Amino acid sequence: AIDYENGVLGGVSSVLQAFTAPGEAILLHSPAYIGFIGTITNMGQKIVYSPLKKDEQGVWRMDYEDMDKKLKENHIHLAIFCTPHNPCGRVWEREEIEKAMEVYEKNKCLVISDEIWSDLTLEGHKHIPTQSVNEYAHEHTFAFYAPSKTFNLAGLVGSYHIVYNSYLRD
């Protein structure tokens, strides 16, 4: 279930090309990594943003009601999820990822999970792989990883994906 990709954005492009049509909407949290914005628009899809909200302590949180509303209103069946989040740096807790995946499942939405920053978390924070939180996440998520952030190897462009569902993988 692990295979090579020509960079995370190359992998994202491959998934967009295989599972969406030009003009389809893709759900993306904002603020968003500029690479996602360019890749989605260059592939001909449109972006529907679900803004992250700061709570009373200044911690970025997902707005699950907004996600659900946007998925339904725009008939979205593919979302990009960034964990840890880029550019906010937020390391999502298991319960937050579980709740996001419940929203995606309710809307029959596939998920691209960019986990390229998974090795770089501050003390007291632990990266939870998206595919580990429930069965839906395990079977409906394209998870992307790369050594480029951890080991400063961006020039090598290599990355890999983990896809457990053989239909999605093939």
Language-model segments: residues:
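Conserved core of the PLP fold type I
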Residues: A1-E102, D119-E123, H127-S132
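Conserved Rossmann-like nucleotide-binding pocket used by diverse enzymes
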Residues: V48, I112, A143
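Walker B catalytic acidic pair
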Residues: E115
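Residue-level marker for buried hydrophobic side chains located in beta-strands
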Residues: T83, V111-I112
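A short helix->loop->beta-strand "cap" motif at the edges of active sites that frequently abuts
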Residues: E24, Q45, Y104-L110, H138-E139
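Alpha-helix termination/capping residues and helix-transition junctions
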Residues: T20, E73, L110, E135-H138, ...
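Active-site PLP attachment segment
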Residues: V133-D170
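Short, Asp-centered acidic motifs that coordinate Mg2+ and/or phosphate
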Residues: H77-L78, L110, F142
